[in-house]
A protein has these predicted regions:
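Cytosolic, long alpha-helical scaffolding segments
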Residues: 1-238
Length: 238
């Protein structure tokens, strides 16, 4: 009876961790979309809400870490049970960093002064954001469902995000060289594109955490990367 009670208590602890991660993930997804939307529409109020929303992300991460450590101390789990708890902490850490990146984009809204808004660049940024947001949702669904094939599909998809980011950098550099008045807007857009690309990297981290949680080992294959977003590599003609 004692063993059964302990098992039920552990399952309850684990379910609560999973619920908290899902709640955190939902907030992060919204932050990504809102931060880019605020930037594109020059919506200062929305940008401020994104910045303010990061505090809740941080709070949830702290709760997840505290509950995870307490569960390990009380239940002394082993093997897959221990990996489940460690994975919850790792996913929460990546989500917190994604929240920081979205917050950074939200802060940039107030700095935009130019009315320069080339439609091609805006569409590229929106497409990149849609792709990354979809990957975040997919990898969190894979984490909750213990769906390894779905997690690996996200892991393999990071290269597409990198390719879009590199293309955007080249376009932005071209606009800056054509007219110095475009520089301020383009620089902010560059940082935002890079932040979205980094969000993709954190999403890939979560996919690797799912692999570790299920398989009990790290992925040995080299992570697919197509990022060439340095100023030198992104110059037209390179």
């Amino acid at each position: 009876m004692g063993t059964e009670h302990t098992a039920k208590a552990f399952d309850s602890d684990l379910q609560e961790l999973t619920r908290l991660v899902a709640e955190m993930g939902g907030l992060v997804e919204r932050m990504i979309v809102d931060s880019v939307d605020a930037l594109i529409r020059r919506d200062l109020a929305l940008g401020k809400r994104v910045v303010a929303g990061d505090a809740e992300i941080d709070r949830l991460q702290h709760i997840i870490e505290e509950r995870a450590v307490l569960t390990i101390a009380r239940r002394q789990p082993m093997a897959i049970d221990l990996r489940e708890i460690v994975s919850a902490m790792r996913v929460a850490t990546d989500l917190e960093r994604i929240g920081d990146l979205a917050k950074n984009m939200g802060k940039r809204v107030a700095a935009l002064e130019s009315d320069f808004q080339p439609l091609k660049l805006i569409r590229g940024l929106e497409h990149m954001t849609d792709l990354v947001t979809s990957q975040v949702k997919s990898v969190l669904d894979a984490y909750a469902a213990h769906d390894l094939p779905a997690a690996m599909a996200v892991w393999k998809g990071d290269e597409e995000v990198d390719a879009i980011c590199t293309s955007l950098f080249r376009e932005l550099l071209t606009y800056m060289m054509e007219d110095p008045r475009n520089i301020s807007f383009c620089i902010h857009l560059m940082f935002c594109a890079k932040n979205i690309e980094r969000i993709g990297d954190h999403t890939t981290n979560i996919a690797e955490t799912v692999f570790y949680m299920i398989e009990g080992q790290q992925i040995l294959d080299k992570r697919p990367k197509g990022d060439m977003t340095t100023f030198a590599n992104a110059l037209p003609g390179n």
